[in-house]
């Protein structure tokens, strides 16, 4: 595997690709995900998952099931639910926001996201900014070149090393306009950040967001770290073993207070039950929403403290 691409990013791409190809009723379709991976990487991730069946599902006997059946189960139960459902929710919310004046889309921690290459009609009318670590972004651009894709004119790559770079300065230098209504996706990140780091990011987002701008992110609830569900425990253990331990979780009240501190109001919050009903069951997919993980859509309130839903 390319050492510049984390196993997390490759697993996410594999999950998108495998789900798209093998699920009769997919939650989220990404026909480009596989193209960003080499055949060797795809096979390596597949082997990694099959080798870990006993970790994911100790009661399963790999010798008694076909590899494709095992992969389908592990992907749909352990690998794909969070990345796929949050992507489906975010892109649906983005398109709704675009109908009411949103002009810019910022993907924080873009990784191997393919939105800018799947949604050409959106790119024709809106600017998209992919923010990620310089090494990760260099690797992705090499992959894009290898596939022969043309980078859309309205897509800007914004390399940011959060240990030393200023997000606001980097985005504005790349052409971001903080006076324009924007949409920020911040997916799969809050788990790994300290409360202080999350507070710092929200400070930056507050300065970047014009009134009525939107941020969408996923986060673990207050019971996450004490959860008894096996796949939640596995996720916590894998993160720790990979050197990126999960650190933060929030109750609704804690999250509401934190967002209000930075000028954001919660417009919509999806619990696992909501995700199951509104995303998975609606698609007809064979999947269960990840326990203790919520999705939050928050909107920047105006300078006078009032807020109107029609500003979304």
Range-by-range predicted roles:
Residues 3-7, 16, 227-312:
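Rossmann-like AdoMet/SAM-dependent catalytic core
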Residues 155-157, 166-169, 192-210:
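A short, conserved alpha-helix within the catalytic core of class I
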Residues 145-178:
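S-adenosyl-L-methionine
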Residues 97-101, 174-182, 209:
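Glycine-rich phosphate-binding loop signature in dinucleotide/nucleotide-binding domains
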Residues 208-223:
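Conserved beta-strand signature within the Rossmann-like core of class I S-adenosyl-L-methionine
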Residues 1-106, 112-158:
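Rossmann-like AdoMet
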Residues 174-197:
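A short SAM/SAH-binding and catalytic strip from SAM-dependent methyltransferases
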Residues 120-125, 176-178, 207-210:
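Short, conserved loop/helix-junction motifs that constitute active-site signature segments
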């Amino acid at each position: 595997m390319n050492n510049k691409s984390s196993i997390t990013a490759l697993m996410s791409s594999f999950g998108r690709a495998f789900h798209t190809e093998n699920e009769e009723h997919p939650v989220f379709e990404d026909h480009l995900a596989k193209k960003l991976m080499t055949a060797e990487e795809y096979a390596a991730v597949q082997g990694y998952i099959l080798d870990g069946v006993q970790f994911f599902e100790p009661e399963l006997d790999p010798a008694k099931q076909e590899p494709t059946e095992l992969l389908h189960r592990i992907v749909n139960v352990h690998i794909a639910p969070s990345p796929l459902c949050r992507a489906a929710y975010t892109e649906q919310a983005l398109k709704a926001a675009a109908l009411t004046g949103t002009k810019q889309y910022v993907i924080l921690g873009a990784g191997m996201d393919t939105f800018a290459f799947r949604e050409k009609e959106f790119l024709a009318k809106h600017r998209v900014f992919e923010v990620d670590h310089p090494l990760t972004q260099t690797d992705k651009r090499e992959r894009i070149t290898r596939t022969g894709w043309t980078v859309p004119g309205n897509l800007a790559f914004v390399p940011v090393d959060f240990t030393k770079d200023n997000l606001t300065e980097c985005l504005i230098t790349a052409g971001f306009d903080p006076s324009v209504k924007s949409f920020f996706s911040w997916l799969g990140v809050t788990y790994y950040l300290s409360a202080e780091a999350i507070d710092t990011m929200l400070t930056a987002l507050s300065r970047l967001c014009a009134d009525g701008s939107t941020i969408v992110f996923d986060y673990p609830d207050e019971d996450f770290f004490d959860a008894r569900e096996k796949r939640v425990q596995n996720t916590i253990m894998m993160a720790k073993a990979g050197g990126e331990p999960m650190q933060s979780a929030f109750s609704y009240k804690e999250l509401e207070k934190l967002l209000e501190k930075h000028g954001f109001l919660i417009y919509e919050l999806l619990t696992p039950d909501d995700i199951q009903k509104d995303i998975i069951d609606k698609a007809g997919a064979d999947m269960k929403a990840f326990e203790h993980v919520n999705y939050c859509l928050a909107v920047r309130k105006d300078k006078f403290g009032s807020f109107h839903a029609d500003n979304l």
